[in-house]
Amino acid sequence: TGKKKLLDVMEKNAEHIYKHFITEKNEGAPGHPEVELALMKMYRTTGNKKWLQLAEHFINERGEDPHFYEKEAAKRDWTVWGNDPTAHDYQQSGKPVRAQSDATGHAVRAVYLYTGMAQLSAKSGDNALYDACKRLWESITRRRMYVTGGIGSTVLGEAFSVDYDLPPDTAYAETCASIGLMFFANAMLKNELIGEYADVMETAFYNTVLGGMQLDGKRFFYVNPLEVVPGISGVSPTHRHDLPVRPKWYACACCPPNVARLITSFGCYAYGENSDMSFCHMYADGEIKFENGMELVCKTNYPYDMTVNYSVIKGGRLAIRILERYIHTCA
């Protein structure tokens, strides 16, 4: 919109954070990774390298001192609800990020962190960081992801379990976790144009993210089991988290607004571009205008109809290809 009122508020707060951690050199990284993503967005919007520096600092700090959160808890007479400072896997703080290989802990926290890492590696060219992202990507998609693109199989900590522990009836597979997986996949596409990243992004979108919301947008799943057992799901202590029908709302209502922001920014995931090429990652009916000047019209009823037609309205002065993938990821 070009309006800066909200951005000015964000930068004012970011200046305070920058002063505390960079200027005054205080130790620490955020407990729930997400400010890194906001800082990267602010950097892309403003070009201010301070926000890139701060995001990089938080990513580099995580896991350097695995006991940091324990020290912080000892300074206070209270702790955030449900936050065990000794649970290093839960908060991805057991190792420095470049040494991590297995996706562990709270699934949403994990993929938000990995998204920030992938965004930073794409911007900085940090090969060691991207190598870590690739290892973590393989850990998720080869061994710790449901066929629906759901991740985080255990209710205990809303977390990743061990390899291949993917029970269908007690699955957690939080909607926000699959949204975060889409964030991660999209960030990986900024590093390398590999079809697998788009495949997983599409799988998560059609099978878990959209499934997490009723068609009329009035009811939502927080948890997305692959199997519901009548009389047990939502009732038994072992299955109480797996509800058989979508509730209207939640006390912890992170998923509905997360779905809303993803859908309203869908074009950023369906399409991409660089200096001389435009990309189609997913298929959606509509008009597309790229920053490089190219304009397309896509006509499709995908995924109900496998036909996808593109019309080039404006080619611009650049040599542009559209990269398409085989359609096979929608259930």
Over which residues does each language-model region extend?
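Glycan-recognition and catalytic cores of secretory/periplasmic carbohydrate-active enzymes
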Residues: 1-331
